[in-house]
């Protein structure tokens, strides 16, 4: 199968299309045929080898995507072959508050391959079904930016009608936060380092 790897050095020119054996799902795992991907600012940090995001060479980048389940290992019961699913950004963070031990294996970063491949394998517990009303491309934007914004406003912020929400710039997390805050009846204030960006939002 074809995958994209960070090879030989860091930076966008380090990305190379290479061949790897198609993965086989083990017990409680599913095999996905990937259909769409989404690029976040974090991908630039990973590909450029910046700070804690610096991966080993040979890493498959990109954390967000959508695929179709094409095979399942023994013991898989919640997800079925043919389901359209998205891997979660932190496959080991299944519940509870943020903690370092749950965050160490973010997809496509320092400790785990990402989804920029024809096929990927994940634990059944680490994928979620995608709503039919969303296209593959729309759903592929949710795992990092969408869930980050939702978690900030719903779990930490508990935004209610009439609240004010300040977002920084017009990146993916900010635009999701703007939409979610408006859905909850909040007033949204966008800040920016230039005068042009807020007027376009």
Please place each PLM-identified region on the residue numbering.
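Short glycine/threonine/proline-enriched tight-turn/helix- or strand-capping micro-motif at secondary-structure
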Residues: 12-21
